[in-house]
Amino acid sequence: MKYIPVYQPSLTGKEKEYVNECLDSTWISSKGNYIQKFENKFAEQNHVQYATTVSNGTVALHLALLALGISEGDEVIVPTLTYIASVNAIKYTGATPIFVDSDNETWQMSVSDIEQKITNKTKAIMCVHLYGHPCDMEQIVELAKSRNLFVIEDCAEAFGSKYKGKYVGTFGDISTFSFFGNKTITTGEGGMVVTNDKTLYDRCLHFKGQGLAVHRQYWHDVIGYNYRMTNICAAIGLAQLEQADDFISRKREIADIYKKNINSLVQVHKESKDVFHTYWMVSILTRTAEEREELRNHLADKLIETRPVFYPVHTMPMYSEKYQKHPIAEDLGWRGINLPSFPSLSNEQVIYICESINEFYSDK
């Protein structure tokens, strides 16, 4: 068996055709037809009114926070079990991230812990739909409304996921997506900010375009940023969007093969009730942290790449000064593994991965 990476993009649609159109037209920077086409199609498919492209998923989060007016002295509640970009974006604004633990069943942010962490400085709750499984948005939105808080959805890992029949990204005041090369759809590097609020949308456009005023050419009235996506990236994104349903369907098939064939000593991250899980990364739990490293080494010997589940951000040096224990997130972070999950994986490859895992557990 050849080397199996943990992820690789599937560029099997009209990516080359659309990129060549950009090259032929010479519209290769942040202006061009594909920007608008991608934004419009993305908004339509995700059932939101407004969508604006950005250069990556991290700046999408920063832009969303800026649009909400989050700044120094504010607190933003965020799960500790997440990729660090979610937390860093809060720090970029001068606000303070307040960490919450995870739910043991779903791995998503704990609603009960959110409630305990709200203070008079809290301005927003940032929900991160970890590995493609939605958070409990009904309870989170209800809690946020009762406390007059903004809700930001970080959908970087959950494009196409649904909670009670509604797409993630449609529950919050503002939501973000990432299109890095290992995401469900990719632009190479890129992101999107979506909202149903025209004021927030306009603020995003203003900040992402160097703070350019609308009433006078080359007049800037705020300190803005260059967070724009290129036309070439948008062209790739549009081609990816046209294949998105097939990508997600295949990823769910892959997850089913894993669930049906992996040794019962391993716990597979599953789909909860009322949730449509897109399985960005099919993830498993070993019994101990030591066993995880042994299994990862075993799989590496079999030419199978894996990743550790994210380490809780509150344990990292720049965020651990006021350490508080978050036991569930810490447990998941030490025992979890991400398995190869990209759409072009063959059934034969997935079965080989399952057999390699089962071989490891054959004498356990």
Swiss-Prot record:
SUPFAM superfamilies: PLP-dependent transferases
Activity modulation: Divalent ions have no significant effect on activity.
Pathway(s) served: Bacterial outer membrane biogenesis; LPS O-antigen biosynthesis
Keywords: Aminotransferase, Lipopolysaccharide biosynthesis, Pyridoxal phosphate, Transferase
EC number: 2.6.1.102
InterPro entries: DegT/StrS_aminotransferase, PyrdxlP-dep_Trfase, PyrdxlP-dep_Trfase_major, PyrdxlP-dep_Trfase_small
Residues bearing the modification N6-(pyridoxal phosphate)lysine: K183
One MF term in the entry's GO annotations: GDP-4-dehydro-6-deoxy-D-mannose-4-aminotransferase activity
Family: Belongs to the DegT/DnrJ/EryC1 family.
Subunit text: Homodecamer.
Protein name (Swiss-Prot/TrEMBL): GDP-perosamine synthase
Organism: Escherichia coli O157:H7
Lineage: Bacteria, Pseudomonadati, Pseudomonadota, Gammaproteobacteria, Enterobacterales
Gene expressing this chain: perA
